């Protein structure tokens, strides 16, 4: 943060001394800046854990904040949704540094319409301090080469548009993008301008989408480390998603070491979620509290 400048040296000696003394007193009284690692939670995580309790997570924002969560990565589909979510989160002291959205950029007819909608989301998000939009291309198994090329071209255009707003496009992926040798995953990153399209590193989808392979996780990180601006964290035990983020199938010590070598400090977002076989022993707020504490200890 920029520090304010001292009073002009042209002031009288006594006046300057008094002014400096006053400023030092103000600094002493000011609260220390929070240096802890900023940890956000994805809306999918909030929704799935609170759904186990038959509760709408939007009614529990204060509880989520009190659990040690700094922000929520909301899932948004329109400009109006974006503005409404940003206000609700801000009212509860929750940041919206990143948001998540999707769109069909591989289809010739839908492309221009989708670009306009997505650019509006960026415009509406900017006033709330959003720095990253995590973008997952609309899923379609086995996209043709023509569709992949068109999609990457449109993502370049979208990323350039968001960049003008000071927002980074971070490519997000699931198992679909890793099918057929990962041709979609790799073409998005090889077929776009690194200044326009960056990466949300999905360590557990890299793992699961590659046949539960840690080799793939760390190869993906090594290949595209210069593009990573966001990281979604999820863990599993014996290939079933665990209730909290902690020790498990993916080596977090190695992951933390890799993330600390990134050229840019990545935005950390918890994306832990329950699935069939996930234990149910904790209330959602406790899941978030334990996960955030672990992440700060391991990755901070």
Model regions: which residues?
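A cross-domain feature marking catalytic cores of carbohydrate-active enzymes
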Residues: 41-45, 74-76, 98-103, 135-137, ...
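Glycine-rich, proline-tolerant flexible connector loops at the mouths of alpha/beta enzymes
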Residues: 73-89
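Histidine-acidic metal/acid-base catalytic patches
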Residues: 2-40, 47-68, 182-201, 205-300
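The substrate-binding groove and active-site-proximal loops of carbohydrate-active enzymes
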Residues: 103-109, 246
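Active-site acidic/histidine proton-transfer and metal-coordination neighborhood
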Residues: 11, 18, 31, 88-91, ...
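Residue-level detector of anion-binding/catalytic polar loops
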Residues: 70-71, 95, 131, 168, ...
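Short secondary-structure capping/turn micro-motifs that flank functional sites
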Residues: 80-81, 105-106, 141-142, 178-179, ...
């Amino acid at each position: 943060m920029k520090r304010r400048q001292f009073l002009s040296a042209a002031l009288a000696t006594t006046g300057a001394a008094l002014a400096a003394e006053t400023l030092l007193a103000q600094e002493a009284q000011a609260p220390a800046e929070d240096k802890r690692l900023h940890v956000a939670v994805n809306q999918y995580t909030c929704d799935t854990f609170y759904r186990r309790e038959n509760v709408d997570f939007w009614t529990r924002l204060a509880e989520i904040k009190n659990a040690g969560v700094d922000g929520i990565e909301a899932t948004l589909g329109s400009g109006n949704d974006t503005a409404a979510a940003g206000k609700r989160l801000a009212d509860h002291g929750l940041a919206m540094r990143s948001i998540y959205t999707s769109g069909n950029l591989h289809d010739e007819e839908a492309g221009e319409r989708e670009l306009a909608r997505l650019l509006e989301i960026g415009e509406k998000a900017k006033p709330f301090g959003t720095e990253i939009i995590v973008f997952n291309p609309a899923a379609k198994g086995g996209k043709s080469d023509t569709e992949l090329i068109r999609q990457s071209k449109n993502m370049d255009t979208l990323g350039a548009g968001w960049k003008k707003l000071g927002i980074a496009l971070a490519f997000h992926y699931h198992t679909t993008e890793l099918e057929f040798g990962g041709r979609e995953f790799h073409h998005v990153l090889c077929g776009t301008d690194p200044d326009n399209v960056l990466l949300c590193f999905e360590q557990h989808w890299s793992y699961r989408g590659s046949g539960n392979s840690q080799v793939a996780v760390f190869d993906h990180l090594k290949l595209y480390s210069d593009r990573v601006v966001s990281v979604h964290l999820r863990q599993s035990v014996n290939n079933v998603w665990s209730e909290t983020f902690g020790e498990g199938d993916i080596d977090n010590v190695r992951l933390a070491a890799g993330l600390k070598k990134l050229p840019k400090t990545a935005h950390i977002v918890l994306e832990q979620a329950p699935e069939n076989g996930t234990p149910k022993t904790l209330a959602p707020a406790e899941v978030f509290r334990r996960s955030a504490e672990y992440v700060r200890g391991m990755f901070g």
